Amino acid sequence: MIVFYLSGDRVFSTDQNAINGLYNKRHFGKLVEGKLFLSLLEATYLVERGKIEVREGKRKLTVEELMNLGRERDELFDAKYLVYKDLRDRGYTVKSGLKFGSHFRVYRRGMDEHSQWLVWVLPENSRLSPNDITARVRVAHGVRKNMIMAIVDEDADVTYYKVEWVRF
């Protein structure tokens, strides 16, 4: 079992098996100075699947404890996790979309050089202004990506909507 250690709002490992298997082959995390860092979303997903364990000191953390840590830091953590999990389970590579004003960048199966989609996660009861939608679609269009809205309902089902410019 590959061991990761909690460090703030992410986890890390220096295990070469983690770096080779999770980063190089399956495109999880970010490699910084010989350490593989995973977000809490990635760590929760991998712990839930029995691929890694996360420790805080010597204590092993459960999936629920990781979920609670995520919830403390992000009120949308549950919705984001459902979308992250759904996309990963479908075989897509999912990375942070922060620098593009979205929650995720999503790559086709495998890992192309450029992501195909930007995904914005919203609970179904969210209120959206036309300006919010326009701004996000404009950014996606400007970086040649498709904008996807992932709506999570109260039954934890995810529905995806592609939002794009239409020219007449």
UniProtKB/Swiss-Prot annotation:
UniProt catalytic activity: pretRNA = a 3'-half-tRNA molecule with a 5'-OH end + a 5'-half-tRNA molecule with a 2',3'-cyclic phosphate end + an intron with a 2',3'-cyclic phosphate and a 5'-hydroxyl terminus
InterPro entries for the chain: tRNA_endonuc-like_dom_sf (IPR011856), tRNA_intron_Endo_cat-like_sf (IPR036167), tRNA_intron_Endonuc_cat-like (IPR006677), tRNA_intron_Endonuc_N (IPR006678), tRNA_intron_Endonuc_N_sf (IPR036740), tRNA_splic (IPR006676), tRNA_splic_arch_short (IPR016442)
UniProt name for this protein: tRNA-splicing endonuclease
GO cellular component: cytoplasm
Transmembrane segments: none
Family note: Belongs to the tRNA-intron endonuclease family. Archaeal short subfamily.
EC number: 4.6.1.16
Gene3D superfamilies: 3.40.1350.10, tRNA intron endonuclease, N-terminal domain (3.40.1170.20)
Function: Endonuclease that removes tRNA introns. Cleaves pre-tRNA at the 5'- and 3'-splice sites to release the intron. The products are an intron and two tRNA half-molecules bearing 2',3' cyclic phosphate and 5'-OH termini. Recognizes a pseudosymmetric substrate in which 2 bulged loops of 3 bases are separated by a stem of 4 bp.
Enzyme type, top EC level: lyase
Keywords noted in UniProt: Lyase, tRNA processing
SUPFAM superfamilies with a match to the protein in the record: tRNA-intron endonuclease catalytic domain-like, tRNA-intron endonuclease N-terminal domain-like
GO molecular function: lyase activity; nucleic acid binding; tRNA-intron endonuclease activity
Biological process terms in GO annotation: tRNA splicing, via endonucleolytic cleavage and ligation
Organism: Thermococcus gammatolerans (strain DSM 15229 / JCM 11827 / EJ3)
Active site: residue positions: Y107, H114, K145
Pfam family, one: tRNA_int_endo_N
Quaternary context: Homotetramer; although the tetramer contains four active sites, only two participate in the cleavage. Therefore, it should be considered as a dimer of dimers.
